Swiss-Prot record:
SUPFAM superfamilies: XseB-like. It is an enzyme of class 3 (hydrolase). InterPro entries: Exonuc_VII_S, Exonuc_VII_ssu_sf. This is Exodeoxyribonuclease 7 small subunit. Keywords: Cytoplasm, Exonuclease, Hydrolase, Nuclease. It catalyses: Exonucleolytic cleavage in either 5'- to 3'- or 3'- to 5'-direction to yield nucleoside 5'-phosphates. Bidirectionally degrades single-stranded DNA into large acid-insoluble oligonucleotides, which are then degraded further into small acid-soluble oligonucleotides. NCBIfam families: PRK00977.1-3, PRK00977.1-4, xseB. HAMAP family: Exonuc_7_S. It comes from the Bacteria. GO terms for cellular component: cytosol; exodeoxyribonuclease VII complex. Pfam families: Exonuc_VII_S.
Amino acid sequence: MADNTVADVKKLSFERAIEELESIVKRLEDGKVPLEESVTIYERGEALKRRCEELLRQAEARVEKITTDASGRATGTAPLDVQ
């Protein structure tokens, strides 16, 4: 895949990347795409998948739970334990 295509994928928001990835999956599942084009869009799909995973990891790292005092007022944040 061309470097400019990878750079293009790195600029996409999560929503845009997942939307395009879903479109690629549908096209490949339909089976009406010529072989060479299938390979090309599959490669782009892989790059989109990696982008979505990267953005999800970043979001997960930023998620924090709000801590409160006895009266229920927010007192700060702490890392969210997702286990």
